[in-house]
């Protein structure tokens, strides 16, 4: 059979296989279109579980007569127009496939009117070529979509539909999820002429618990702990259930990314990990969580139904969610959200602890106790689709500006360097947290000027690990592995408050001998100072967190070696231990390239500026260019 272009109806039916799984899929797509249109009221009418009729009526902005025909065409949308728009999506829909796909497997009628039009217009597509017919109609400002006889022309799909009760149950669940995402929108759900759900609009944050109770039930609300956490462009708020009550609330698992309902495995894993020590294998956590993130940092165009997303910084997002949920669950005597007759909610007492992966817990401040948990949980919710606009996300994160300021300070004549004689001479600084300032060297012997703070330009790299650089008017070979060791020494030298522990994605189980167990107990404070969270029970250790420089190491091998080293010393300083660790950590690169060398030297110049003026043995070897030139010229 020769290659041929498929007719529009067949092409749309193929696309419908991905978009339209069952009546609930139709409801989801159409209601999301209403939300994108700025609707504040949506009425949903269902007959026979959606097999006979699905009607969605809204008071949104409507569709003009000139755009009605395009609305039913494939790949036609008003929500994106360029690749840049696709990379920063905030609207619910964007592909322009839903209406065309639905109309190809049903009898779809679209009626709409804009505020500028004096009358409404109705459109429907029919025939093999999906030709669109438009005629005048009576309708207020907004749109109504009627989907009749779903799958009437695809008997195989219709045969796989479940009972009326089952299909309506799926529709009810979709509406529940959407109602939790948009508190500011009133939603009514009718089945066979009977009002089943009525979710009144709750624009006031103090009223959000009312809708939460109507959707998730009073039992969830009574055991809910409010959460509100922020780090840079990441923000999470919502509610998590007390683990003691999770066995009765396991079905309550709702998560949203930029107000889009999700069933993402990374998010579920982070939440499950936060609960793992509080629930058995048969129990599931209960939660309603909202994650707001820079739309440039998340790709929603990876799943046909948009149920999953891909985060550009998946580990950061995972650790952020894990730490936020863990901090709330670790509250001692955390009160439940108990609604009084006046609708007031008692504020929980927040734990004074927050690791770098999760940012600063702004609700650990004394004044936070004066505000209600409801206000905390929804302080950053967007009010409506019309008012919601893409935030002006900054290109540089705050910590990058802070590091840049520190970098400029190093160029000032007032900064000074001390000659490096041993690894212990490296300044006690840490980069495991962007918020920890780099400590300057106070015992100055020679000022560090902007002209001589740098090693010089990297010319090339000789495999596996030597960089040829411009140095003091000549050239020199620099050992990248030695420079990396000095950098790790600086990163591992703890400040007064210690290194910040970074939680592992999965806690590591390690078997120890008696000497290693004794070393773990004797040097517990030192390990905490180094950002290592290690607990021992019945001869087995559980490693839960390490400082940032250790995250990429082979911890299964490194930790027993570290404890073996500690068992040989009764007392040891953090700087000495940092020196030992720096010499035992594996290199991140077997063979270096120019870009990796430039990145490494930039970090070394910022954190270890004293190495530039007084390079230690083994780091730098100048090359005598004059001798080479003399040989070439036979002088």
UniProtKB/Swiss-Prot annotation:
Any one biological process term the GO annotation gives? mismatch repair
Molecular function as annotated in GO: ATP binding; ATP hydrolysis activity; ATP-dependent DNA damage sensor activity; mismatched DNA binding
**Which superkingdom does the taxonomy of this entry point to?**
Bacteria
Q: Which GO CC annotations does the UniProt entry carry? A: mismatch repair complex
- What InterPro entries does the record point to? DNA_mismatch_repair_CS, DNA_mismatch_repair_MutL, DNA_mismatch_S5_2-like, HATPase_C_sf, MutL/Mlh/PMS, MutL/Mlh/Pms-like, MutL_C, MutL_C_dimsub
Q: What keywords are annotated for this sequence in UniProt?
A: DNA damage, DNA repair
Coiled coil stretches, renumbered = none
The record, for PROSITE patterns, names: DNA_MISMATCH_REPAIR_1
Q: Which NCBIfam families match?
A: mutl, PRK00095.1-1
Recorded hits in PANTHER family, A to Z, give: DNA MISMATCH REPAIR PROTEIN MLH, PMS, MUTL, DNA MISMATCH REPAIR PROTEIN MLH1
The family assignment reads: Belongs to the DNA mismatch repair MutL/HexB family.
- Recorded protein name is DNA mismatch repair protein MutL
Which organism encodes this protein?
Yersinia pseudotuberculosis serotype O:1b (strain IP 31758)
- Species lineage: Bacteria, Pseudomonadati, Pseudomonadota, Gammaproteobacteria, Enterobacterales
């Amino acid at each position: 059979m020769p290659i041929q272009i498929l007719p529009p109806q067949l092409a749309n039916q193929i696309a419908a296989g991905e978009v339209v799984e069952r009546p609930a899929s139709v409801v989801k797509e159409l209601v999301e279109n209403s939300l994108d249109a700025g609707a504040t009221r949506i009425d949903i009418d269902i007959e026979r579980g959606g097999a006979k009729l699905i009607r969605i009526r809204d008071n949104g902005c409507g569709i003009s007569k000139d755009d009605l025909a395009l609305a039913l065409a494939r790949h036609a949308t008003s929500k994106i127009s360029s690749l840049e728009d696709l990379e920063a999506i905030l609207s619910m829909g964007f592909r322009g496939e839903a209406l065309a796909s639905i109309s190809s497997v049903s009898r779809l009628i679209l009626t709409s009117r804009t505020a500028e039009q004096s009358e409404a217009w109705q459109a429907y597509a029919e025939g093999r070529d999906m030709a669109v017919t438009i005629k005048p109609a009576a309708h207020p400002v907004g749109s109504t979509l009627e989907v009749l006889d779903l799958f009437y022309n695809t008997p195989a799909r219709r045969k796989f539909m479940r009972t009326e009760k089952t299909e309506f149950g799926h529709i009810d669940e979709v509406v529940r999820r959407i109602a939790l995402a948009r508190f500011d929108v009133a939603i009514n759900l009718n089945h066979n002429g009977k009002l089943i759900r009525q979710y009144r609009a709750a624009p006031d944050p103090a009223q959000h618990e009312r809708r939460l109770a109507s959707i998730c039930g009073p039992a969830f609300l009574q055991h809910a702990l409010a959460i509100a956490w922020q780090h840079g462009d990441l923000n999470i708020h919502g509610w998590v259930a007390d683990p003691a009550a999770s066995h009765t609330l396991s079905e309550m698992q709702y998560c949203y990314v930029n107000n889009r309902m999700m069933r993402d495995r990374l998010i579920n894993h982070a939440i499950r990990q936060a609960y793992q020590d509080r629930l058995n294998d048969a129990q599931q956590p209960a939660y309603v969580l909202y994650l707001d993130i820079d739309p440039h940092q998340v790709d929603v165009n990876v799943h046909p139904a948009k149920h999953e997303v891909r985060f550009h910084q998946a580990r950061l997002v995972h650790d952020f969610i894990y730490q936020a949920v863990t901090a709330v669950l670790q509250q001692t005597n955390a009160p439940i959200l108990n609604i009084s007759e006046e609708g007031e909610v008692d504020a929980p007492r927040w734990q004074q602890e927050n690791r770098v992966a999760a940012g600063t817990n702004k609700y650990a401040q004394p004044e936070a106790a004066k505000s209600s948990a409801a206000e905390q949980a929804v302080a950053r919710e967007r009010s409506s689709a019309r008012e919601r606009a893409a935030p002006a996300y900054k290109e540089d994160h705050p910590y990058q500006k802070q590091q840049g300021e520190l970098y400029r300070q190093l160029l000032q004549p007032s900064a000074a360097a001390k000659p490096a004689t041993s690894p212990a001479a490296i300044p006690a600084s840490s980069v495991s947290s962007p918020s920890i300032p780099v400590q300057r060297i106070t015992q100055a012997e020679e000022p560090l000027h902007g002209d001589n703070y740098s090693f010089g330009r990297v010319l090339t790299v000789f495999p596996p690990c030597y960089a040829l650089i411009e140095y003091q008017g000549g050239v020199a070979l620099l050992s990248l592995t030695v420079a990396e060791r000095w950098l790790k020494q600086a990163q591992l030298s703890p400040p007064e408050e210690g290194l910040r522990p970074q939680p592992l994605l999965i806690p590591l189980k390690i078997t120890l001998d008696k000497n290693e167990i004794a070393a773990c107990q004797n040097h517990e404070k030192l390990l905490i100072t180094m950002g290592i969270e290690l607990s021992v029970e019945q001869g087995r250790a559980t490693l839960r967190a390490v400082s940032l420089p250790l995250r990429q190491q082979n911890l299964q091998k490194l930790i027993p070696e570290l404890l073996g080293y500690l068992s040989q010393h009764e007392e040891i300083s953090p700087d000495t231990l940092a020196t030992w660790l720096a010499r035992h950590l594996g290199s991140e690169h077997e063979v270096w390239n120019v870009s990796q060398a430039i990145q490494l030297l930039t970090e070394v110049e910022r954190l270890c500026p004293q190495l530039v003026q007084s390079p230690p043995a083994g780091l730098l070897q100048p090359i005598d260019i004059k001798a080479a030139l003399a040989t070439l010229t036979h002088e």
